[in-house]
Amino acid sequence: MGKGSIASHKEEILLAGCAIVIICFWYFLFPHLLLMREASQLFLWNSEYFAERIVVPGGFAQYIGEFLVQFFHHPFNGGLIYAALFVIAQQLTKHIFPRLPLLLTFIPSFVLWAIALYFYIPLTLTVAILMVMLMIALLPKRKTARIAYIIILLPVAYWLAGPADYYWVEEHPSTLEEMKYDLMMRQKDWKGIVERYNKQPSASPAVQHASRLAGFQLGIIPEQSLHRADIFSNQSLRSEASSFIMDEVYFLLGLVNMSQRATFEAMESIPNHNKSGRALKRLVETSLITQQYPLALKYLDILQETAFYRQWAAQTRPLAENPVLIQQHPRYQSLREAYAKTKDAVFY
């Protein structure tokens, strides 16, 4: 490819390069943030869910944002989606400001990329901004038509994209760290947890409990070291990520009631009060173990309206409908036996 050919395709090369960098950035460096975003919502494929969103200003932008976030269940998909949004933002900027130098048309894309790193700012904001940019890009060139377009578009834009509001949410400094440990807990990466903690000890109580559990799983520490009094401290549940960590710790230790409570704490910690597909999945498991079968069926009915939990819900339903099958389940039966022998406890 000659210099002239490269110059003529400079924009395409820049976009392709940025897209690859963004995909790698999210997939290799921040998969924990993508997965926690996915765990912080419950997108349902039914008309009631759509109607619940669309009846409020900005609900359509929220619906589209949550539709996209459900695919973060696989981090590579999240990287692809963010890369696509980056390209769309650059192309819309170029269309709105055709005389702007090429490199400057990337500024809105990089700003949206930076915003995406803040966990408490949902994808709704990015979608709403792109919707408004698209509406501006479609402005007619004739003055009369443009005025009519703006008059009609203003209320439509307000309803679809929603109003803007800004408020300060103090993000706990250990939140991202807890998300990383939460991902390793889900992957059962016990060696990685121990190595990371030994390299850089954490002040997070949840991370400390996770490191002790990992040490036990590797045979480094005895089981007695796990049953400390502070394992029931509510200081371990100060964020959504830490609550999910403790849910895993309690569940693997056979403290099923505590796992259930930590799961509820995680769901209540979601910033916009969404429900969580990941949390409901765990609540199905705890309900099966504690023999609350009608409750398990209720949660399974909800999960069957999702894209990425539907198959698991269909496979698990027979256990709730015919509890005798749980006796043949290698995990649930052993946890049921541990639950029956374990004294219940409460947070303090």
Model-derived regions, located:
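Start-transfer (signal-anchor) and selected internal transmembrane alpha helices
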Residues: 1-22, 146-150
